[in-house]
Curated annotation (Swiss-Prot):
Membrane topology according to the record: Multi-pass membrane protein
Intramembrane portions: 109-116, 177-189, 193-201, 387-401, 402-404, 405-416, 417-421
Protein name in the entry: H(+)/Cl(-) exchange transporter ClcA
TM stretches of this protein: 33-69, 77-100, 124-141, 148-166, 215-232, 253-281, 288-309, 330-349, 355-376, 422-438
Source superkingdom: Bacteria
The organism of origin for this protein: Salmonella paratyphi B (strain ATCC BAA-1250 / SPB7)
Compartments (UniProt record): Cell inner membrane
Feature type site, description Mediates proton transfer from the protein to the inner aqueous phase: 203
Amino acid sequence: MKTDTSTFLAQQIVRLRRRDQIRRLMQRDKTPLAILLMAAVVGTLTGLVGVAFEKAVSWVQNMRIGALVQVADHAFLLWPLAFILSALLAMVGYFLVRKFAPEAGGSGIPEIEGALEELRPVRWWRVLPVKFIGGMGTLGAGMVLGREGPTVQIGGNLGRMVLDVFRMRSAEARHTLLATGAAAGLSAAFNAPLAGILFIIEEMRPQFRYNLISIKAVFTGVIMSSIVFRIFNGEAPIIEVGKLSDAPVNTLWLYLILGIIFGCVGPVFNSLVLRTQDMFQRFHGGEIKKWVLMGGAIGGLCGILGLIEPEAAGGGFNLIPIAAAGNFSVGLLLFIFITRVVTTLLCFSSGAPGGIFAPMLALGTLLGTAFGMAAAVLFPQYHLEAGTFAIAGMGALMAASVRAPLTGIVLVLEMTDNYQLILPMIITCLGATLLAQFLGGKPLYSTILARTLAKQDAEQAAKNQNAPAGENT
């Protein structure tokens, strides 16, 4: 009997020691294994939430379109209903952002960059529900926004949530898990794991603290996020444009010309985004009623636009393969391009919860295809395929605007599965980036972050000035 009791006690002691070792391992922030395990958790959660966000947005869009189909034969009902449904959905997103989490407005990527520098707060308990539900409203309304920015911000906030739940207190763990979540978010949005890694290294290079632990954590999170995405959505490329032909060496100079065009377009586009933001700020002046009504009007107009010209509304993923296939004339491509520039400015600059990656990719596709079709007419001896210029244009506008050419190249190649076009992509994106920099253009996300920080400092200074003298001493 004593022997059985002794054996039982020995087993209990061994179990307690193992639990204590695991607990101490998880509490030691400097332990790479603990951070890597947490990175795997962050990547898995980001993949699950990213897939759920995609499905939720699609569900809202299908419900809205289904309601319109029911009254398609009655024009006097169709047009008002299209406006009202999209307006109400958009107003939900604008209201939630303005009321509960202003940092959830817009793309969210500048907020993650600011958080990596410890300059912006990460209130995940507010941002996660607001960004998810608000994004369902604005994207479901058919507004010209993408889901990649929200997914990146959601991923970063999930990283901070995991950090808080497991009480990891070191600055290294806090920074690493935030970056891991952001990279996993981009991977989950585009099914582009390598682009997710490069996005953190390239776009967030001023903020990302590169070391062996942090980069391994980012790799781990992106792997888990991609696995989750592919379990639910399969392994097919997210944009189906088919296998395009190679670009002959004697045509590569045309891709440099295309890059020069985007090098001019990028800074102009960025400037228009910032000016439109200022215009909206002057209009609503921070008043929630004006802001929500303004958002409802923009959402309603996008709903109407979706009836008139479906290609001019929505994020643009459905438009890209249609445009790249050469189904539109050059004139129609340019018309849709201009229309989508206007709608992108209105939707994104108004502060709606939604990204600008997908709209920029669509804009690049439209202009690239138009250039390719024109070049095919001017140089028939080259037997050009307009789709190859569409692929190059997708990455070029992003390279010129965001100033992340490597991310743009890899992202487009992963999304379209046309890796044979890597050389023309490099030429186009490099030309666009160099000219945009030469013209004095600033990276879009960095500029938005700088404006946010300036506004934050001004608000803090005003609070300090208005505070009683006793509180400042």
